[in-house]
């Protein structure tokens, strides 16, 4: 055995005890509100098409699958949970393992714990208030600041993300030391996202959580487009102390529109020489059957616990980080 091998957990036993207490409190939060806890598969025959997500892939070989069946570890339980909603589950939540074949570091681990929940008949604002309630309970923090994506951009970059052109975006990127990257990027939306990541995120949610809502419609993902302003989507994200904690939507219910978005993602993947991903036909069938009007959110539990315990890094609050797995 290598002398550098460490069998010990990355988190202290004291932190693991505190972690267990926080997870128990999260469960109470939802059971007290009549939200059903569910479990869904960790693997699927389909996966996300989002160009910024990298799923793990494996092969299932068993009876009737002599040549093997490609399976994907879930980056989120979203698709399966929406199928439950379409089947009439009512409000549901899940605490589960999710997997993303991406970086490992202070705020990232390729295997992580996700809290995801869905509220039929909630709009985006009502769900944001419930997320705020949960954060105040777990983090003992102040009520969050609420600002639109447009307001955040104007405040910190003095640019309107809904109307700014690519030349102005590249000029702003140059001021942030990102000129070399920006000059090679021709997609306007990617430039907007880059400026938000490096020019806005570091400045919000420092003293209390910040909810940023009404993302550009080009970043709608699985969210509805706002009926009041078609330039924006009913999507929000939550930030606190430099960490992205949660991502929520008023959920898209139109199966045809969702298929178009998946296909558009795959076209973007092809343009970037990324593998095109299999579209989840089961999800689309559920949407066609009828997904109730609802809002949903995914929250990173390890990051939440890291903040609650004032830990320096994720490995301080998970039993075994990927380096010790």
Curated annotation (Swiss-Prot):
Q: Which GO terms describe its molecular function?
A: acid-ammonia (or amide) ligase activity; ATP binding; lysine-tRNA ligase activity; tRNA binding
Q: Which InterPro entries match?
A: Aa-tRNA-synt_II, aa-tRNA-synth_II, aa-tRNA-synth_II/BPL/LPL, EpmA, Lys-tRNA-synth_II_C
Instruction: Quote any Pfam family the record assigns.
Output: tRNA-synt_2
In this chain, substrate is annotated as bound at: 76-78, 118, 251
The question of whether Nucleotide-binding is a record keyword is answered with yes
Instruction: Supply the SUPFAM superfamilies for this chain.
Output: Class II aaRS and biotin synthetases (SSF55681)
Q: Which domain of life does this protein belong to?
A: Bacteria
Instruction: Enumerate the PROSITE patterns for this protein.
Output: AA_TRNA_LIGASE_II (PS50862)
Catalytic activity reported: D-beta-lysine + L-lysyl-[protein] + ATP = N(6)-((3R)-3,6-diaminohexanoyl)-L-lysyl-[protein] + AMP + diphosphate + H(+)
What family does this belong to?
A: Belongs to the class-II aminoacyl-tRNA synthetase family. EpmA subfamily.
Subunit info? Homodimer.
Q: What does this protein do?
A: With EpmB is involved in the beta-lysylation step of the post-translational modification of translation elongation factor P (EF-P). Catalyzes the ATP-dependent activation of (R)-beta-lysine produced by EpmB, forming a lysyl-adenylate, from which the beta-lysyl moiety is then transferred to the epsilon-amino group of a conserved specific lysine residue in EF-P.
List the PANTHER family: ELONGATION FACTOR P--(R)-BETA-LYSINE LIGASE (PTHR42918:SF6), LYSYL-TRNA SYNTHETASE (PTHR42918)
Task: Tell me what this protein is called.
Answer: Elongation factor P--(R)-beta-lysine ligase
Q: Record the organism.
A: Pectobacterium carotovorum subsp. carotovorum (strain PC1)
- What are the leading ranks of the lineage? Bacteria, Pseudomonadati, Pseudomonadota, Gammaproteobacteria, Enterobacterales
């Amino acid at each position: 055995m290598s002398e550098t091998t460490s069998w010990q957990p990355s988190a202290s036993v004291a932190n693991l005890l505190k972690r267990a207490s926080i997870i128990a409190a999260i469960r109470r939060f939802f059971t007290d509100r009549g939200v059903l806890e569910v479990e869904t598969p960790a693997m699927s025959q389909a996966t996300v098409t989002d160009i910024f997500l990298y799923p793990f892939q494996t092969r299932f070989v068993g009876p009737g699958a002599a040549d093997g069946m490609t399976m994907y570890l879930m980056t989120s339980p979203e698709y399966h949970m929406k199928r439950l909603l379409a089947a009439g589950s009512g409000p549901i939540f899940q605490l589960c393992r999710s997997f993303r074949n991406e970086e490992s570091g202070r705020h990232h681990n390729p295997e992580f714990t996700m809290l995801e929940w869905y509220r039929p008949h909630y709009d985006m604002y009502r769900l944001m208030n419930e997320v705020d309630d949960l954060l105040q309970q777990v983090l003992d923090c102040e009520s969050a600041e609420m600002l639109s994506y447009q307001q955040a951009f104007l405040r910190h970059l003095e640019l309107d993300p809904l109307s700014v052109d690519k030349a102005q975006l590249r000029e702003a990127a140059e001021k942030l030391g990102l000129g070399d990257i920006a000059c090679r990027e021709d997609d306007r939306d990617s430039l907007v996202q880059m400026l938000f990541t490096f020019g806005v995120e570091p400045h919000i949610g420092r003293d209390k959580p910040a909810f940023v809502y009404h993302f550009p419609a080009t970043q709608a993902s699985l969210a509805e487009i706002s009926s009041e302003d078609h330039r924006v989507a009913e999507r929000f994200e939550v930030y606190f102390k430099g960490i992205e904690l949660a991502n929520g939507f008023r959920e898209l219910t139109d199966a045809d529109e969702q298929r178009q978005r998946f296909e558009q993602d795959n076209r973007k993947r092809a343009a970037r020489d990324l593998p095109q991903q299999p579209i989840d036909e089961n999800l689309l069938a559920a949407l066609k059957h009828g997904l109730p009007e609802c809002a949903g959110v995914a929250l990173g539990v390890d990051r939440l616990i890291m903040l609650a315990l004032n830990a320096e890094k994720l490995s301080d609050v998970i039993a075994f980080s990927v380096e010790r797995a």
